[in-house]
Amino acid sequence: MGIIQTKDLNLYYGNVQALKKINLDFSANTVTALIGPSGCGKSTFLRTINRMNDLISTVKIDGEVMFEGKDVYKDYDEIELRKRVGMVFQKPNPFPMSIYDNVAYGPRIHGIKNKGKLDEIVERSLKGSALWEEVKDRLKKSALGLSGGQQQRLCIARTLAVEPEVLLMDEPTSALDPISTLKIEELMDELKHKYTVIIVTHNMQQAGRISDNTAFFLNGEVVENGKTEDIFYKPKDKRTEDYITGRFG
């Protein structure tokens, strides 16, 4: 059994069904790419895993989302869940404060006040997001002065600072230039040694480069999922082949 499982997961926005009987199993220490055309349910699905959809009043969910064998909607407080299942969004969203304070923000909320401990967490997290060498001499400067790619790696460091087990990434490179994108992709290969990574991407080449497993979403359903090399080179469903080869999407 994987670290995360979904069983017959359905999600509705009011009367509109956005996810239909999603059954997926995510193994620990892997990168899984969620692919599919715009509006197919990838990001909606990602947000069910750490209950971000709770913030939308019209959302109704049935079925199960299991994290380490427990139902995230019944057995977890959402604050604790989001600490253990972190999220990185499409656009970098640094807080308007120093680089140091951005990374220390989460640990402080969770009660860590000792400066030595915070220093250690900040350095470890920035090293974990491959940003430390670029910012170690300006930790007290505003995070808003960083480039877009640096800001996104800062957001990853901020997520790592609270020691999650799973990282959810919603198109984390779509707003970045090719060089910054490459740095994030290289980082993901490192991150999977410590974390389980689930990434939504529209970039087929990116999905092929970075992921161990891939799930193809279409119209709120999972058409096919499995090892990335099988999905890309030996798809079982013609719709998967048509999407990956660019015939639609």
From Swiss-Prot:
Quote the function comment for this protein.
Part of the ABC transporter complex PstSACB involved in phosphate import. Responsible for energy coupling to the transport system.
Question: Can you name this protein?
Answer: Phosphate import ATP-binding protein PstB
NCBIfam families (alphabetical): 3a0107s01c2
Q: Which UniProt keywords apply?
A: ATP-binding, Cell membrane, Membrane, Nucleotide-binding, Phosphate transport, Translocase, Transport
Q: Which residues form the ABC transporter domain?
A: 4-244
Q: How does it sit in the membrane?
A: Peripheral membrane protein
* Location of this chain's protein in the cell: Cell membrane
Q: What is its main location?
A: membrane
Q: Which residues bind ATP?
A: G36, P37, S38, G39, C40, G41, K42, S43
SUPFAM superfamilies, per the entry: P-loop containing nucleoside triphosphate hydrolases
Determine if Transport is one of this entry's keywords: yes
User: What are the BP-aspect GO terms?
Assistant: phosphate ion transmembrane transport
Record family assignment: Belongs to the ABC transporter superfamily. Phosphate importer (TC 3.A.1.7) family.
Q: What is its EC number?
A: 7.3.2.1
Its subunit composition reads: The complex is composed of two ATP-binding proteins (PstB), two transmembrane proteins (PstC and PstA) and a solute-binding protein (PstS).
A GO molecular function term, named singly, is: ATP hydrolysis activity
The terms describing its cellular component in GO are: plasma membrane
Class of enzymatic activity (EC top level): translocase
**What gene is this protein translated from?**
pstB
Q: Give the reactions, separated by semicolons, that this protein catalyses.
A: phosphate(out) + ATP + H2O = ADP + 2 phosphate(in) + H(+)
InterPro entries given for it? AAA+_ATPase, ABC_transporter-like_ATP-bd, ABC_transporter-like_CS, P-loop_NTPase, PstB-like
Q: Name one Pfam family in it.
A: ABC_tran
